[in-house]
Curated annotation (Swiss-Prot):
NCBIfam families: guaA_Cterm (TIGR00884), guaA_Nterm (TIGR00888), PRK00074.1 (NF000848). The active site is at C90, H178, E180. The gene is guaA. It comes from Prochlorococcus marinus (strain AS9601). GO terms for molecular function: ATP binding; GMP synthase activity. This is GMP synthase [glutamine-hydrolyzing]. It is an enzyme of class 6 (ligase). InterPro entries: Class_I_gatase-like, GATASE, GMP_synth_C, GMP_synth_GATase, GMP_synthase, GMPS_ATP_PPase_dom, NAD/GMP_synthase, Rossmann-like_a/b/a_fold.
Length: 528
């Protein structure tokens, strides 16, 4: 069945034009939290495409550029005459002002970063129920000097005269602060006001409606063909397995490829849970030695990811020929996966959008060019928290839904440098201790990820009056809402001490434990 014959996917009620902001996807998440579907699109989107999508509202994101720079990113200026409500955030507001005849100036002497009280100057639908002098998050070096005709100043801060503006006739609004970040006390109120009071959206983006819309789309796309799913036991592939099982039943075959990089006890748990408990067909493939052989001598993390991804598909192809034929490969690709694997940025010389790769994602970056399957990726527009809700609605238990995210390449990218069985055994034991103690302390559900990393160096230690020269283990525990940004977890010292003591006493070849306190950004959650 051709892709063009499929039923039309749901169009977003709110379009977010991305001008390079680190918060663009966060804006999308916040809008979805109001039960309204939103998507991030290029700032170069055409007027024709906007009219085809017919959104209820448009948001112009922030960005790192200055609007008066020669090649500053822009959008089609006709967008402001479509009659669609528009909210410009930070750079987005400045761009709107400039395009409509106002002026923006450098405000290096009064640049504003961090928390600032918002002083409301006049009533506005945008600031309805927002308390005067509430704290909002600022992050800008430029400011509006002169408003275009028809605009009013509706709020200011100590250093920003035009902290919020409006043109009620044309339904054009702007804020210099970032309502999408948690530091803005009434940020969600501002977003809800734009979504509901101004754009008149309907709260119809729910877990139930997603399932209702997705199941018939899967059936239409797949027809009577067979689907193969790589089942890892994580929340993404598990939710996808339940979703596909509900949609197409015995047309689905789940394949668990044990590449040797799983956490302690996971292969046994996975087979018992899906095959025996829920009677979803799972084929177990032991490919441990095959993967280890492929990684021999490989130290570069991108190479490891690519090799694992390609080998994964090769095994899939071989096993599908034996068990199949299968025409479709189902993947648990999520929205942040797509964003991270092919992010976007603006070329400062040409103003053109360019791809910026952060690191390849196992699902979307490691696929070989001669892939023999068609793809089924019904989760690719969802964030992680949305996937968990879908899983819960489909009947997945908490022990799966609340499991910490685990990368596709597994422990292979938590061992820095070359991977071998000795290092895997060492890391597997250390990682199990980390998670065991976190669970005993009742902190597991409060932490986004908690795991161990094995470094490719050795350190000197003393154990039993003898000198040791062994590997160090890094503890990595982070708090996050969606994995796009993260802060290191402030775990009580006594728990960290218990973890460290157990690792150095119970895990052979480890004599030192350190704790990573780097946030994302500037670091990433995984070390590779």
């Amino acid at each position: 069945m051709s892709q063009t014959s499929l039923k039309k996917e749901r169009d977003p009620s709110i379009l977010i034009l991305d001008f390079g902001s680190q918060y663009s996807e966060l804006i999308a998440r916040r809008i979805r939290e109001t039960n309204v579907f939103s998507l991030v699109v290029s700032n170069f989107i055409s007027i024709e495409d906007i009219n085809r999508i017919n959104p209820k509202g448009i948001i112009l994101s922030g960005g790192p550029n200055s609007v008066y720079e020669q090649n500053a990113p822009r959008c089609d200026e006709k967008i402001f005459n479509l009659g669609i409500p528009i909210l410009g955030i930070c750079y987005g507001m400045q761009l709107m002002v400039k395009e409509l005849g106002g002026t923006v100036i450098s405000a290096t002497k009064k640049a504003e970063y961090g928390r600032a009280p918002l002083n409301i100057d006049q009533e506005s639908d945008l600031l309805f129920d927002v308390e005067d002098k509430s704290i909002m998050w600022m992050s800008h070096g430029d400011s509006i000097n002169c408003l275009p005709d028809g605009f009013n100043k509706i709020a200011h801060t100590e250093n920003t005269l035009h902290a919020a503006i409006s043109n009620d006739v044309k339904k054009l609004f702007g804020v210099q602060f970032h309502p999408e970040v948690v530091h803005s006390e009434f940020g969600m109120r501002v977003i809800k006001n734009f979504v509901y009071k101004i754009s008149c959206c309907t709260a119809d983006w729910t877990t139930e409606t997603y399932i209702e819309e997705t199941i018939p789309r899967i059936r239409e796309q797949v027809g009577n063909k067979k689907v193969l799913l790589a089942l890892s036991g994580g929340v993404d592939s598990s939710t996808l397995a339940f979703l596909l099982n509900k949609a197409i039943g015995n047309q689905l075959t789940c394949m668990f490829i044990d590449q040797g990089f799983m956490r302690k006890g996971e292969p046994e748990f996975l087979m018992n849970f899906f095959d025996k408990k829920f009677h979803i067909k799972v084929e177990y493939i032991n490919a441990r030695e095959r993967f280890i052989a492929k990684l021999k001598g490989i130290t570069d993390p991108e190479q490891k990811r690519k090799i694992i991804g390609e080998e994964f598909i090769r095994v899939f192809e071989e096993e599908s020929n034996r068990l199949g034929p299968f025409q479709y490969l189902a993947q648990g690709t999520l929205y942040p996966d797509v964003i991270e694997s092919a992010g976007t940025n603006i070329d400062p010389k040409t103003g053109e959008r360019i791809a910026v790769k952060i690191k390849s994602h196992h699902n979307v970056g490691g696929l070989p060019k001669d892939l023999q399957f068609k793809l089924v990726e019904p989760l690719r527009k969802l964030f992680k928290d949305e996937v968990r809700k879908v899983g819960a609605a489909l009947g997945l238990p908490d022990e799966i839904i609340k499991r910490h995210p685990f990368p596709g390449p597994g422990l292979a990218i938590r061992i820095l440098g070359e991977v071998n069985n000795e290092k895997l055994d060492c890391l597997r034991d250390a990682d199990w201790i980390v998670r065991d103690e976190i669970k005993k302390a009742g902190l597991y559900n409060d932490i986004w990820q908690a795991f161990a990393v094995l470094l490719p160096v050795k350190t000197v230690g003393v154990m039993g009056d003898k000198r040791t020269y062994s590997w160090p283990i890094v503890l990595r525990c982070v708090s996050s809402e969606d994995g796009m940004t993260a802060d290191w977890s402030k775990i009580p010292f006594q728990i960290l001490e218990r973890i460290a003591n157990r690792i150095v006493n119970e895990v052979i070849s480890v004599n030192r434990v350190v704790y990573d306190i780097t946030s994302k950004p500037p670091g990433t959650i995984e070390w590779e």
